[in-house]
Amino acid sequence: MLRYFFIIFFIPSIVFAEIENARDLMEAGKFQEAMEELMPAARSGNADAEELIGIMYAMGLGVEQDDVRAFEWYLRSSMKGHPGAQSGVGWYYEIGRGLPAPDLVRAYM
């Protein structure tokens, strides 16, 4: 029973701390370190981490700017209901960056 208590209450706070640490690193301009903090959380399905990685690829922060990868990370996060990522996906559909062509129908859905 105590084991479940630990899993339910402490594991999410550890992940939240990793995301906040990554944001602090991004604000300090340490993008490579931020990516190293974010990648494990994103691979385990954390929508905030996925959205931040999308931002890094979209803006070329610590990685080579890549609209296709940015769109993929935004899309993963948006499928989990992340509002910032949903906005990013809509923008990519509207402008058509990272896609074969703009898709205004999907952009405004």
Map each language-model feature to its residues.
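Sec-dependent signal peptide recognition
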Residues: M1-I8
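TPR/TPR-like (Sel1-like) alpha-helical repeat modules
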Residues: P102-M109
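Short helix-capping/linker turns of helical repeat alpha-solenoids
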Residues: R43-A47, M59-L61, D66, M79-P83, ...
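Hydrophobic face of amphipathic alpha-helices that form TPR/SEL1-like repeat modules
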Residues: I19-L25, A41, L52-M59, V63, ...
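N-terminal signal peptide c-region/cleavage motif recognized by signal peptidases
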Residues: P12-A17
